[in-house]
Amino acid sequence: MTLTASSSSRAVTNSPVVVALDYHNRDAAMAFVDKIDPRDCRLKVGKEMFTLFGPQFVRELQQRGFDIFLDLKFHDIPNTAAHAVAAAADLGVWMVNVHASGGARMMTAAREALVPFGKDAPLLIAVTVLTSMEASDLADLGVTLSPADYAERLAALTQKCGLDGVVCSAQEAVRFKQVFGQEFKLVTPGIRPQGSDAGDQRRIMTPEQALAAGVDYMVIGRPVTQSVDPAQTLKAINASLQRSA
């Protein structure tokens, strides 16, 4: 498996690493970003930072050369979700996501909203089962399937609706590649280099394990953002992935 990522012509990196920016303070976030190279990773902006700092924050990251995964997990009626996804495309992000549990009509509407953007459209990914959830959490919601089985059901629906791939745990990646094919992109949080604390992610893997499992894009947060030397940490991760490829 190569490290070449399939994305739009805007992409400046072939690294599968996506760094999760989880900061409460804008200046701290920018201080971190200015230490790293857009050739070594992409950046993920989630609900907290987008709510705090808005679209302009995303534009500033893009001006520094970074591809952005806008991780807002849209989940609404089809028309609203479609407009939200189109707004993300207008912002020029590299990837955007929705909740697969929003259903087929919602996901189809979101996909159709990106058609006018052509090759400049962001990758559209669906969230299956959050990596923090265990079987007991699903049971509380009335879902009797295991996290893996439920994620596979939602992934199948996602592919049927024509989306580019899913967010899933690394443990599901091997089977998903077998079932859904190589072109169906797998985006995986809960990736932590050897020796890192597991944090609040229940189902985790190292970057090397994730690559071997078939993960296309791996989200890494605190092991990079809290590193004394984040630029070197990223280079070490990428070098390790190149050796493992």
Curated annotation (Swiss-Prot):
Residues that, per the record, bind substrate = 22, 44, 71-80, 131, 192, 201, 221-222
Q: Name one GO cellular component term.
A: cytosol
InterPro entries from the UniProt entry: Aldolase_TIM (IPR013785), OMPdecase (IPR014732), OMPdecase_AS (IPR018089), OMPdecase_bac (IPR047596), OMPdeCOase_dom (IPR001754), RibuloseP-bd_barrel (IPR011060)
- E.C. number(s) listed in UniProt: 4.1.1.23
Looking up Pfam families in the UniProt record yields: OMPdecase (PF00215)
- According to the record, the signal peptide region is none
Q: In which pathway does it act?
A: Pyrimidine metabolism; UMP biosynthesis via de novo pathway; UMP from orotate: step 2/2
- Catalytic reactions of this protein: orotidine 5'-phosphate + H(+) = UMP + CO2
Keywords, ordered alphabetically: Decarboxylase, Lyase, Pyrimidine biosynthesis
Disulfide bonds, paired cysteine numbers: none
* Protein's UniProt keywords contain Ubl conjugation: no
Q: What class of enzyme is it?
A: lyase
| A GO molecular-function annotation | orotidine-5'-phosphate decarboxylase activity
Where are the active-site residues found?
Answer: 73 (proton donor)
Similarity field: Belongs to the OMP decarboxylase family. Type 1 subfamily.
Supply the HAMAP family for this chain. Answer: OMPdecase_type1_B
Q: What does this protein do?
A: Catalyzes the decarboxylation of orotidine 5'-monophosphate (OMP) to uridine 5'-monophosphate (UMP).
What is the name attached to this protein's record? Orotidine 5'-phosphate decarboxylase
The source organism is Escherichia coli O45:K1 (strain S88 / ExPEC)
